[in-house]
Regions:
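Alpha-helical protein-protein interaction elements
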Residues: 1, 25, 42, 48, ...
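N-terminal secretory targeting modules
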Residues: 1-75, 81-82, 86, 91, ...
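Soluble periplasmic/extracytoplasmic beta-strand elements of cell-envelope proteins
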Residues: 74, 99-100
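Alpha-helical cap/lid subdomain in secreted, periplasmic
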Residues: 90-97, 106, 112-264
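Short hydrophobic segments within beta-strands
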Residues: 76-77, 169
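Short substrate-entry loop that stabilizes the transition state in hydrolases
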Residues: 83, 107-108
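Catalytic nucleophile serine of serine hydrolases
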Residues: 79, 102
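Short, flexible loop segments at the rims of nucleotide/cofactor-binding pockets, characterized by
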Residues: 48-53, 103-107, 192-193
Length: 264
């Protein structure tokens, strides 16, 4: 119990400091007490299980080995992958031997820690890695492009060492088009500068080409002439809506097909 109150105190103190800084408005107002409780609970969970290994532990334990001819694919990622199996978006590739292992809010160091349990142990033919946007935003603290690239390279190399082919998916564009319920702009590009996203995508494309992987370019298909996430593809300037996933799905299928046909 004392630990819980200590976490609450830490969250309150952090919130007080953050309130003095200009912040990106949230999409909708929330009850302060409920928000504080939620943040304290998340903080406690992160203390116990920072990489969220427990999230898929049970599901992994009941996942049977792939059949001889099964082209099993695991999707590793953050909220964009995590939300893909939401019924609102038509489900996660119905009828396909694809496994969703996305976790909302995660960064590449967290994914790297759980990569063996959530990808390698499931024995897929291929992994699709969509990661990096939360690193750029600093979800788990300050970082550098070099550190993000190192984590992505480590996941790539771990997969290859275990006979798993790799698709590197580009980080999606973001936009500043959306507004909160009280009309305030949601400025996504402040936390996720487009030039950093572009640099990371350029690196992934080059790394995949040099090491026998496939680069999946969501960015070009989803960006407008300003380089922003097209307004009709998102409700919050960050996450795809149904139309967004409808753009992404066939691109993912094309990349998977290409990767499975490759000899690397």
């Amino acid at each position: 119990m004392n630990r819980f109150f200590a976490i609450v105190y830490l969250v309150v103190a952090t919130a007080a400091i953050a309130s003095a800084q200009p912040a990106t408005p949230t999409p909708s107002p929330v009850d302060p007490c409920a928000a504080l409780t939620t943040r304290a609970t998340r903080a406690e969970t992160r203390l116990r299980d920072w990489p969220a290994l427990d999230r898929y532990r049970e599901a992994n334990s009941t996942t049977t080995p792939p059949t001889k001819d099964e082209n099993r694919v695991v999707f590793m990622g953050d909220s964009i992958t995590d939300s893909w199996d939401d019924p609102r978006y038509g489900g996660f590739f119905p009828g396909k031997p694809y496994i969703d292992r996305g976790i909302s809010g995660q960064t590449t160091p967290q994914m790297l820690i759980r990569f063996r349990a959530d990808v390698i142990a499931l024995k897929p033919r291929l992994v699709v890695i969509l990661a990096g946007t939360n690193d750029v935003a600093g979800n788990t603290g300050p970082t550098t492009l070099q550190a993000i690239e190192d984590n992505l390279a480590s996941m790539f190399d771990l997969a290859h060492a275990n006979g798993i082919r790799v698709v590197f998916a580009s980080v999606l564009p973001v936009s500043d088009y959306e507004k909160t319920t009280d009309g305030q702009p949601i400025v996504r590009t402040k936390q996720r500068p487009p030039e950093q996203i572009a640099a990371l995508n350029t690196w992934m494309k080059k790394y995949a080409a040099m090491h026998g992987g496939i680069y999946l370019d969501y960015f070009s298909a989803m960006a407008d002439d300003k380089g922003f996430l097209r307004e009709e593809l998102s409700e919050d300037g960050l996450h795809p809506n149904q139309k967004g996933y409808e753009v992404m799905a066939p691109l993912a299928e094309q990349a998977i097909t290409a990767a499975l046909k490759s000899r690397s």
